């Protein structure tokens, strides 16, 4: 068996694809990694949420699976839209890495001076920042991680926010501050590397051997909220499943309000959640 692994060509995406390749190689499977540039990598002038959210990083690769140009696609699970083509599935995930966010800066969030400039393109992070520090400035930040760090070094920003999992996978060594769960509820599926394939592919039997069951169940619970409420990838929502509990934070699109909800993730009540956020503009 020979498996063609598709991924974005960014350094982080290639690292994640190689993590999957290494696990398949350990099973004696012949693999190759193919890197591609996505629409989201080309359009760096617009805020991410204005061009379709993180799903723009996923769609092109998924189409390549359907065209038989690649066999599987490796994605950051948080980038995968709530709904994908009916003939595709998330067939496996690797064990979840730290789902929290980090602030890369010389100063902690509490110690930043007023009017400090923080870079992020995430509506969730923007809302979280404004809730905690409405005296700082938030500036859109796009590009791969090396580009973002260069902009930080050039003085365009006083700090930037990124996923702790990405920070660790890239082996970045900079002064940083981990943002706790209470203040920054992680994005749904943050820290999870997911593999998409055709539902009827014989490759899926192999992929099951590298799947982490606990992470897969957490991923499904978080995605159930996204799909059940038709939230998509770009809404200001934090969702984190852990040890059979699911923690949710919904930020209003109309004002600075937010709602925290906690449930047993084996008994998710979508109607209750919908009633709690009915006037949030989703």
UniProtKB/Swiss-Prot annotation:
Q: Which GO terms describe its molecular function?
A: hydroxymethylbilane synthase activity
| UniProt keyword Transmembrane helix present | no
Q: What is its EC number?
A: 2.5.1.61
Stored Pfam families? Porphobil_deam
Any miscellaneous information on file?
The porphobilinogen subunits are added to the dipyrromethane group.
Main function: Tetrapolymerization of the monopyrrole PBG into the hydroxymethylbilane pre-uroporphyrinogen in several discrete steps.
Protein name per the record: Probable porphobilinogen deaminase
């Amino acid at each position: 068996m020979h498996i063609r692994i598709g991924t974005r060509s960014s350094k982080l995406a290639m690292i994640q694809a190689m993590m999957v390749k290494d696990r398949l190689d350990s099973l004696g499977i012949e693999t190759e990694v193919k890197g591609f540039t996505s629409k989201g990598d080309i359009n760096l002038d617009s805020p991410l949420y204005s061009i379709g959210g993180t799903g723009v990083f996923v769609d092109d690769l998924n189409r390549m699976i359907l065209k038989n140009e690649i066999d599987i696609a490796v994605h950051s699970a948080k980038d995968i839209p709530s709904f994908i083509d009916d003939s595709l599935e998330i067939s496996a995930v690797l064990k979840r890495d730290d789902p929290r966010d980090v602030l890369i800066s010389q100063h902690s969030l509490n110690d930043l001076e007023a009017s400090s400039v923080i870079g992020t393109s995430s509506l969730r992070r923007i809302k979280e920042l404004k809730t905690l520090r409405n005296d700082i400035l938030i500036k859109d930040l796009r590009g791969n991680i090396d580009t973002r760090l260069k902009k930080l070094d050039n003085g365009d920003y006083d700090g930037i926010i990124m996923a702790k999992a990405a920070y660790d996978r890239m082996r970045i060594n900079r002064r940083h501050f981990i943002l706790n769960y209470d203040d920054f509820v992680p994005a749904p599926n943050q820290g999870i590397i997911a593999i998409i394939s055709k539902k009827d592919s014989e490759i899926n039997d192999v992929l099951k051997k590298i799947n982490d069951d606990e992470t897969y169940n957490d991923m499904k619970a978080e995605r159930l909220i996204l799909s059940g409420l038709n939230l998509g990838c770009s809404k200001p929502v934090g969702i984190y499943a852990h040890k059979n509990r699911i923690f949710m934070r919904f930020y209003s699109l109309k004002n600075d309000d937010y709602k925290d909800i906690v449930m047993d993730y084996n008994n998710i009540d979508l109607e209750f959640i919908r009633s709690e956020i009915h006037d949030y503009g989703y």
